[in-house]
């Protein structure tokens, strides 16, 4: 069982209240602390993905726990962020070698996603990656999510 310590449970009250009972019943606990990473168990949440719903759950958790205090967020940008993160994590899960299925690679992908205001046809490395995936596997979850992200981004 994985517990995410976040702004909703900053003191870990759920872990404190339920942790021992879960351990006694054979559960293994993993703590992912998005407030203080030094107190986190330093595990890789991407290695616990088995299907699409796991990707969606992880993205929801990341977005919920990394939003600033009192920030409601514009639904348009929230949707675009959700689609982008979902597509990138799905790509890593389904297409990348196991050793690249981690947050470091996810951040590298995000960092290469520059845009060119002068050239509408410019494609960054991630665009090219997904263009290739769409040709090889047009029905892949990752390719479909990225296409939706690009459609949403094109609206702005």
Segments from the language model and where they lie:
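Non-catalytic, charge-rich alpha-helical accessory subdomains
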Residues: 77, 82, 86-156
